[in-house]
Amino acid sequence: MSTSSSPYAAFAALLSSAGHSVSPAELHGLLLGRSCAGAGFDADAWLLDAADLLGGEPQDSVRQALIGLQEMVKGELCSEDMAVVLLLPDDETPLAQRAVALGQWCQGFLGGFGLTARDGALSAEAMEVLQDLSAIAQVQSALEESEDGENDYMEVMEYLRVAPLLLFTECAKPAAPAAKPSLH
């Protein structure tokens, strides 16, 4: 698979052509973080947060891509099987660049979660996920171009596909409607 045809590369090219230096990974992390913290899926609120990260109002083509990205995330989080697909460079990209994007994704996620999270207490598991994301964001350059480095990257990526679901389930998933008491 060629790097230029990956969704990540296409989004990066779109952002770059519009004059934005933000990575698609950081934007996707921001969106997923705010969504998992309970921001809901209002497009206008998402576009405001994205504009802050982008450093200004996005052009229409970028705006449409951001709305599409939000629809994709909403579908992933609200489907029965709740599966997250990370917007990261493909496997043909050098490991060092993929590791940097992974760190940017974590930074974006933490920023989005922090923007939106309510003051309620989080479970120990949720706190551990946030601490893990913070640690992953800091070790971007620690992965070496080797089979072990590849394996480490894949393990971290798999963790990041699952960890946000715990936060979404705890902080944002709509509660089942309570049964209405019947009047006798």
From Swiss-Prot:
Family named by the database record: Belongs to the UPF0149 family.
InterPro entries on file: YgfB-like (IPR011978), YgfB-like_sf (IPR036255)
Protein's recorded name: UPF0149 protein Pmen_0324
Database matches in NCBIfam families: PRK02166.1
One GO location term (cellular component): cytosol
Pfam family membership, one: UPF0149
Origin superkingdom: Bacteria
